[in-house]
């Protein structure tokens, strides 16, 4: 174990040294000395030296406005480098990687050793594997794309430096390259100047596909195939594609007025353009590789006399011409030109697949399997995973927008006001119209801009090539009519196929009603006919936690899933649960394997569909090797959850969870909603107001510009509390509830739940992780620098609460200290704290200066503003999961 850490530590200190040299070259010895002094003070402050802690605070408070930015940048860049070293560590032969792709082998061996599972059962479970990862543009990815590219290259240098046999001159060359990259990063502005547009966000998503997934997915399938051959003697079929990627970038218009129908149309074209671009590179390689002459009669018949000399090349060159013509047409469309569709335009995956597969079969039949299973097989697998659309898009819109559109329409038609009808009347109207053969929308109707936008979006879906749009997600869904309304709007747009429409249940009440809503829908004959035995439901993690606190929310999510699984099973419907979880604990994030195995039994039968958000995309898919590792973890977890499902919780455990849920929700809401001091405290103790200035995502931070916590989006809410290290949304209420149940004499029952029920042990594990990242002296320092004295008692109360919570969690988990069973994560948090602490102290100081200036009516000092942005980005890097 320690050898693993020493490799990581030596990389971290080597990168730190290079950064130090860069700072010295750029700004001189005195700034480097200042940074070094602060680092040493921070280290001994962490080790418990109070005098040094005081000195650290004084030093940072006394920095001049000129020193603020370089010091903030030094620690922020250091954390980016530490994250890069850690990312490399997770895939290096000396580090964690030694164990990751092994996950599949371990899982297969574990399954084979179960007497009740035959090899055939395991094989069937593998064949039905389905994993759909939905990339979302969350503003939490605050690192600029240009810096991400440089960090990827730093990673590559670390990999080569790990090779013990490199010659001295190569070693020197690599070190020189590292110095260049770190200097380039230092001299690059790490804060975006402008908010990204939805199209920029989509391009960021395509960059992830190009730089990592394109190579990572075929590598993962090779790995999976090897493990299956070794352990089960089973080969994956060529067309097997368990992984799909979908994106919300350019499709998610919920609360984001910048995502319009035109934007979605543009992103769909852009996505197809990028696919042709990537496939052209693949085909170019195949043109040079497939120079073979021998072919089957079927292939020769396909190429005719003209191509008989080099049949494989002939087919590849033809495909290349079609791709080029398609790309040229898409390019013209993106520029706004209206061109007739060219002959041979590629719109369907089959058109890509058929010539490639014909070559594959012929090579296999002629004894050239070794060639068939090279680059050609990788390309075939990319056709199945990415295909013509590259990534599919989800459309997401809030339920009230559909209700308002239909209200405007019924008023125009003079048949009443849909918005004020009862649920039963709405359903009757919708079902009547869904069954009607005549159109509902009058030709000469001029709807409002809002309604026109909703109708135009449905039009885009109807016109898009089939297979390029994955699902229509309805946020804040509350009733069956919310789902039927979307089906009606899609029918009116002339959509010719059954588009999956997924209600998203995201508040506590909506989660509790989810099963009733779906039961009512499944009782409608017309609806049952339409969905053809398949239903997708999305479970919202972040908004439910913001609404009720993390303990009540997670229990409501569990129960909603459990009830939906049973309802759909009874109705013979294949249910896909779509999990909208974020990177941070307060938004449902948890280590993947643990999180999946803690769901109700049967929840992964319809496959896994999950959002991957913001910075988590980079941590989990930023490099091909990490992609292999993340996909392997998911694969192992899905197989295990489906073949060895977790136990049904005992009735007494459910009762305890009900109790915990009620108590924790009351405590949480008692502070967040009912305590009149809470919102002013939140606004002053965290950088919430300042966060709005960061050019983070393309969507506004608030659903409504004025208003309390409920109008804040879940992301800024969590982001703000992560910055001041109180991490409040991820624990408030949970520990108090546990304490109450312990006092009622049920500690041994809680210990049994922790031991034998994955759902409960994962909850406690997530609390431990949050407590390990939280920091009470820093949270207290923010109060002292920024909060009105009258509100100090509230801050103290919350900090005392957290201390009590830590004790009760450790007692139930039988641990002597936090993260006892995950020393690697504890180590990684400790390593980063030394660099994050000064940024926190500095941030409190900067907030103090900037708010003082505002109070005195002065213009904000650009150096202070810039340094503040840098601390926000740096702390986000230090916490590793921002919002």
From Swiss-Prot:
InterPro entries on file: PEP_COase, PEP_COase_bac/pln-type, PEP_COase_Lys_AS, PEPCASE_His_AS, Pyrv/PenolPyrv_kinase-like_dom
Gene Ontology cellular component annotations, sorted alphabetically: cytosol
GO terms classed as biological process: carbon fixation; oxaloacetate metabolic process; tricarboxylic acid cycle
Magnesium found in the keyword field: yes
Domain of life (superkingdom): Bacteria
Enzyme class: lyase
Active site: 138, 546
Cofactor field: Mg(2+)
Keywords annotated in UniProt: Carbon dioxide fixation, Lyase, Magnesium
GO molecular function: magnesium ion binding; phosphoenolpyruvate carboxylase activity
EC number(s) stated in the UniProt entry for this protein: 4.1.1.31
Entry-linked Gene3D superfamilies: Phosphoenolpyruvate/pyruvate domain (1.20.1440.90)
Reactions that this protein is recorded to catalyse: oxaloacetate + phosphate = phosphoenolpyruvate + hydrogencarbonate
Purpose: Forms oxaloacetate, a four-carbon dicarboxylic acid source for the tricarboxylic acid cycle.
UniProt record similarity statement: Belongs to the PEPCase type 1 family.
Name used for this protein in its record: Phosphoenolpyruvate carboxylase
Organism: Escherichia coli O81 (strain ED1a)
Protein's gene: ppc
